[in-house]
Amino acid sequence: MNDFERSVDFSHRYLDVLSLRQSVISDNIANIDTPNFKRSKISFESELEKAFLNEDKNDLNLIKSSDKHLSGFKNLKYSDVKPHRVLDHFSTMNNNGNNVDIDSEVKALVQNQMMYHLMTNVQAHYFKSINIVLK
C-alpha cells in the first residue's frame, strides 16, 4: 500500500471512530438524569500510537518446542486497531450514582466535532489532489 492509499484509508477509519465517539458522547448526555448511569468513552488513540511506533520494528519470531509455549511478539498494524468502548465505573458526580458531567461531555463533543471537520477537510484535500492530477 502506497502512502496515498494509506493516508486515505487511515482518515476513513478515523472518521468512523469519530462518528462512534459522537454517538457515545450523545448517549452520555441523553442519560445525564438516569440514576446509576455510568458514562462511556471511546479508547482508540493510545493503541493507534503504539501501532505506529512499533510499525517499523521487526516481529519477534520464537522457535517453540511445544504448542503450550508462548508465541513471539507480532507487531500490531494500524489497520488492526479497533476502537473500544470503556465504561467509567470509578467516579460518581451525582447522589443518584450517575457520573455524567455535562461540562466535560460538551467539551468532548465540541472537540470531536472539530476533529471530524478537520478530517473531512483532509479527505477533501486528498481527492482534490487526485482530481488535479487526472486533469
UniProtKB/Swiss-Prot annotation:
It comes from Borreliella burgdorferi (strain ATCC 35210 / DSM 4680 / CIP 102532 / B31). GO terms for biological process: bacterial-type flagellum-dependent swarming motility. One of its GO terms (cellular component) is bacterial-type flagellum basal body, rod. This is Flagellar basal body rod protein FlgB. Belongs to the flagella basal body rod proteins family. PANTHER family: FLAGELLAR BASAL BODY ROD PROTEIN FLGB (PTHR30435:SF12), FLAGELLAR PROTEIN (PTHR30435). It comes from the Bacteria. PROSITE patterns: FLAGELLA_BB_ROD. InterPro entries: Flag_bb_rod_N, Flagellar_basal_body_rod_CS, FlgB. NCBIfam families: FlgB, PRK12622.1. The basal body constitutes a major portion of the flagellar organelle and consists of a number of rings mounted on a central rod. In Gram-negative bacteria, at least four rings, L, P, S and M are present, whereas Gram-positive bacteria lack the L and P rings. The rod consists of about 26 subunits of FlgG in the distal portion, and FlgB, FlgC and FlgF build up the proximal portion of the rod with about 6 subunits each. Keywords: Bacterial flagellum. It is found in: Bacterial flagellum basal body. Structural component of flagellum, the bacterial motility apparatus. Part of the rod structure of flagellar basal body.
